[in-house]
């Protein structure tokens, strides 16, 4: 069991007094994540801007755990909470999207992906329509090379601006990001703050039509009005995660308040009162059944974080097969 957030702040004894952002101890992560489940952040920090974030990083000892979140999609928080600091990049300080030249946009890491798509439409830049259908933010898209409809984030990235744990600025090229399918090999200690994107001049009517098609597809096949973190598992090579989940009989499967969506069975939903334990147990049950059925090991696309409550540890594949 972790100590209180107030106790952690007291240990730092005024080192954070010059910050302009908001420090909130013992904040429920269920208020932040799209699953609306999970335990508290020991301390939540919402920096005002990149300068404020840099000052915070310089003040916090590196041995204190630190986790960065954006708009809260694609996150499953365990019920024991998240120790140390959770840094939430706010839309006010990190959510702007602006056109910087004929073919380029600069976007803050907390900007919703849909805002990037809208800005690209306004600028007459093609190649961003896929963001209109991704329920997440730019920072997460950069970290996991988010993609949809046959397009990936890496195809649009020119350079990424980031801070390290010492508060120093780094500028990473596309190659530095080390992109692969739903993955970047950039150091996990780097905090992305903004990105420079490159688009292709296009006709606004064509761009709008592509965005409408993405939106229609999403509303037709995905549970967009449910409490969900998006796609639960990465697609295995040569097949789709949802197909393997369906073949294993897991469509609609429930654990407590968690359920694999009837509409799209690679989407896990909180039906109303799911705990982090319910959600993760459901996910590991699905992994076990898929492996038993087809020999395929599904890998989580949703990021799981935090501590288990005492006695609620969950083994991979529920310990059945590994």
Curated annotation (Swiss-Prot):
Q: Which GO terms describe its biological process?
A: cell division; cell wall organization; peptidoglycan biosynthetic process; regulation of cell shape
**What does the record give as cofactor?**
FAD
Q: What is its main location?
A: cytoplasm
**Could you say which protein family the record assigns here?**
Belongs to the MurB family.
Q: Tell me the pathway.
A: Cell wall biogenesis; peptidoglycan biosynthesis
Q: What is the official name of this protein in its record? A: UDP-N-acetylenolpyruvoylglucosamine reductase
List the active site.
182, 231 (proton donor), 301
Q: Name one GO cellular component term.
A: cytosol
Q: Does the keyword NADP apply?
A: yes
What keyword terms does UniProt attach to this protein? Cell cycle, Cell division, Cell shape, Cell wall biogenesis/degradation, Cytoplasm, FAD, Flavoprotein, NADP, Oxidoreductase, Peptidoglycan synthesis
Which EC numbers does the record give?
1.3.1.98
* Pfam families tied to this protein: FAD_binding_4, MurB_C
- Which InterPro entries does the UniProt entry name for this protein? FAD-bd_PCMH, FAD-bd_PCMH-like_sf, FAD-bd_PCMH_sub1, FAD-bd_PCMH_sub2, MurB, MurB_C, MurB_C_sf, Oxid_FAD_bind_N
NCBIfam families, alphabetized: murB (TIGR00179), PRK13905.1 (NF010480)
Its annotated function is as follows: Cell wall formation.
Q: Do you know which PROSITE patterns this protein is assigned to?
A: FAD_PCMH
- List, in alphabetical order, the Gene Ontology terms for molecular function in this entry: FAD binding; UDP-N-acetylmuramate dehydrogenase activity
The record's subcellular locations are:
Cytoplasm
Occurrences of domain FAD-binding PCMH-type (ranges): 36-202
Please list the reactions this protein catalyses: UDP-N-acetyl-alpha-D-muramate + NADP(+) = UDP-N-acetyl-3-O-(1-carboxyvinyl)-alpha-D-glucosamine + NADPH + H(+)
């Amino acid at each position: 069991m972790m100590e209180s957030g107030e106790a952690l702040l007291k240990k730092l004894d005024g080192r954070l007094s010059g910050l302009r952002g908001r420090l909130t101890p013992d904040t429920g992560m269920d208020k932040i994540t799209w699953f609306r489940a999970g335990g508290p952040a020991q301390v939540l920090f919402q920096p005002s801007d990149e300068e404020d974030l840099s000052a915070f990083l310089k003040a916090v000892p590196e041995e204190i755990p630190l986790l960065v979140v954006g708009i809260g999609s694609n996150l499953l928080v365990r019920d024991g909470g998240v120790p140390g600091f959770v840094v939430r990049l706010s839309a006010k300080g990190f959510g702007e999207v602006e056109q910087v030249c004929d073919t380029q946009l600069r976007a803050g890491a907390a900007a919703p992906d849909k805002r990037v798509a809208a800005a690209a439409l306004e600028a007459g830049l093609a190649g961003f329509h896929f963001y209109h259908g991704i329920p997440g933010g730019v920072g997460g898209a950069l970290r996991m090379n988010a993609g949809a409809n046959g397009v990936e984030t890496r195809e649009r990235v020119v350079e990424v601006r980031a801070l390290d744990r010492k508060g120093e600025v780094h500028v990473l090229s596309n190659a530095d990001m080390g992109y692969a399918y739903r993955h970047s090999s950039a150091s996990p200690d780097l905090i992305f703050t903004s990105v420079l994107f490159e688009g292709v001049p296009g006709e606004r009517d064509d761009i709008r039509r592509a965005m409408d098609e993405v939106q229609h597809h999403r509303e037709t096949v995905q549970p967009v009005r449910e409490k969900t973190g998006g796609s639960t598992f990465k697609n295995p090579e040569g097949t789709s995660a949802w197909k393997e989940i369906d073949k294993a009989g897991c469509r609609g499967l429930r654990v407590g308040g968690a359920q694999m969506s009837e509409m799209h069975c690679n989407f896990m939903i909180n039906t109303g009162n799911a705990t982090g334990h319910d959600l993760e147990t459901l996910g590991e049950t699905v992994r076990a059944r898929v492996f038993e059925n087809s020999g395929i090991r599904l890998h989580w696309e949703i990021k799981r974080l935090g501590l288990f409550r005492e006695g609620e540890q969950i083994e991979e594949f529920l310990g059945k097969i590994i």
